[in-house]
């Protein structure tokens, strides 16, 4: 099994607590308003805490149409979440799972920095192509910025 690690940081003027709430705890209510059409459908099994499963269907026409996420850890006071992508065509047939750790850290100016670490567990010696990682990073940034704009406006 191969392992690849990718890190991403995005800064915001939105305070850490508000960003974590909007980006993680209330994302299923905010995202349809902030980025209509980003998801086609979301089926949730669980209360949002550890063990919750989300099956996400994305719009047709993109390189990825399905993914299933499992919440592995959640610290509401520390503004962190651990979740894994465990199924769907997002795994491209050569990834076993993607472990993600996301933390929202307060900054000195009252804003926040969202830090994400993704660990790709690949089958055999498969390697996730850099263009796939860049595409995922661009999608994450787009959704983050949509949520950020929504939080600033509301």
Curated annotation (Swiss-Prot):
Database matches in Pfam families: Bet_v_1
UniProt-recorded Gene Ontology molecular function terms: abscisic acid binding; protein phosphatase inhibitor activity; signaling receptor activity
Temperature-dependence annotation: Melting temperature is 57.7 and 80.3 degrees Celsius at pH 7 and pH 3, respectively. Not heat stable, unfolds at 95 degrees Celsius at pH 3. Refolds partially at physiological pH 7, but not at pH 3, after being heated to 95 degrees Celsius and cooled down back to 25 degrees Celsius.
A biological process from GO: abscisic acid-activated signaling pathway
Induction of synthesis: Up-regulated by abiotic stress (wounding) in transgenic Dau c 1.01 or Dau c 1.02 gene-silenced carrot roots, and to a lesser extent in wild-type roots. Up-regulated slightly in transgenic Dau c 1.01 or Dau c 1.02 gene-silenced carrot roots in response to biotic stress (infection with A.radicina).
Tissues expressing this chain: Expressed in roots.
Activity sensitivity to pH: Stable at pH 3 and 25 degrees Celsius.
Annotated keywords: Allergen, Pathogenesis-related protein, Plant defense, Stress response
GO CC annotations on file: cytoplasm; nucleus
Superkingdom to which the source organism belongs: Eukaryota
PANTHER family xref list: OS08G0374000 PROTEIN-RELATED, STRESS-INDUCED PROTEIN SAM22
Similarity section: Belongs to the BetVI family.
Protein name: Dau c 1 isoallergen Dau c 1.0301
Organism in which the protein naturally occurs: Daucus carota (Wild carrot)
